[in-house]
Amino acid sequence: MIDLNQSWPMPDRPLPIVIFGAGSIVMDAHIPAYLASEFVIRGIFDPDQDKARALAAQYGFTAYRTAQEAAAQQDVIFDLATPPDAHAEILESLPEAAGVLIQKPMGSDLAGATEILRVCRARSLRAAVNFQLRFAPMMLALRDAIDRGLLGEVVDFDAWLAVDTPWGLWKFLKGLPRVEILLHSIHYLDFIRSVLGDPKGVHAKTLGHPSGDTSNTRTAAILDYGDRVRCALSINHNHSFGRKYQACEFRICGTKGAAYLHLGVNLDYPKGEPDILEINTGEGWVACPLTGSWFIDSFANRMAQLQRFVTGQEPTLVSGVEDAWTTMALVEAAYESSASPATPLAPKP
């Protein structure tokens, strides 16, 4: 058994949290994760006052009547679980130098991300984007293994999904021109950047499926890291032929070892399956017992790192808006690549 770090230390002086948004991700992940880690939620605001009041009554915190009332809170961390096009306006209203967690994506496109970055710079906000996959126990353990040299130099990274995602759960997706990469595979692209650094570019194709009207649910992408590192993603959310051959896996190979990851939440969503991490350093595959899962443990780890940065316990903010902007640039490049023609075959002479 390999003993690897799987959690982020909690802040010594945790700050209360004010949440914007009372949607399903807040109900199912943010609130349960924060309370399980003994963070205090001071209050919540949502334009749907009934939803906000129901959560406030259930958990014993305040439901603010207006966004302005929520934004006026002092000495808190603001958690923006809001639609991407709403982020910038809320950020403009927050106190100078506030600590903020912004729901991914960082805007609906790169222009939106650039506006969010401008606001955060202008108001000196200590803002991170909620790319919480980096903070999943299995990914923290993988990061620890890589940092300790167990895999050597990482030279191959494969992300392979063949799942049956219930897109109908999210009514707001109907009519959106960008779905799969912007709202799902963005997690994988961000995590890949955290391991391999920034690619030189990307070749990508994203498309929908004849069975539904969601704009894009399948993606193939190759990230260009030069002549030494290979990175490819094959993403299919329409594999509706039973569990037997479905998969949600990362295979990461280095010059000394390899890692296999099974991302359980995407299989039988939203119930999911347990995550799996196995590592092979030359003597066979060894399972790493995991003490939590992507959903919901990563949300508490993500909040803990932000709070430790804001309170001066850590010098670096992971997935801050400066770094997250580059993930958005990669997403934008993938969509631009998909819209561009591929290299054509030569005509037969």
Language-model segments: which ranges?
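Basic phosphate/pyrophosphate-binding loop/patch that engages nucleotide-derived ligands
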Residues: 118-126, 140-154, 251-254
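N-terminal Rossmann-like dinucleotide-binding module
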Residues: 1-59
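Predominantly a Rossmann-like dinucleotide-binding segment in NAD(P)-dependent oxidoreductases
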Residues: 133-213, 341
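Beta-loop-alpha module in the N-terminal Rossmann-like domain of NAD(P)-dependent dehydrogenases
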Residues: 59-119
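Hydrophobic residues in well-ordered beta-strands that form the structural core
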Residues: 102-103, 127-129, 158, 261
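Active-site loop of classical SDR/Rossmann-like NAD(P)-dependent oxidoreductases
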Residues: 25, 47, 291-304
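C-terminal helix-rich "cap/oligomerization" subdomain common to oxidoreductases
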Residues: 1-14, 77-80, 226, 305-349
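Contiguous beta-strand/loop segments that form the cofactor/metal-binding neighborhood of enzyme cores
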Residues: 2-3, 183, 189-268, 300-314, ...
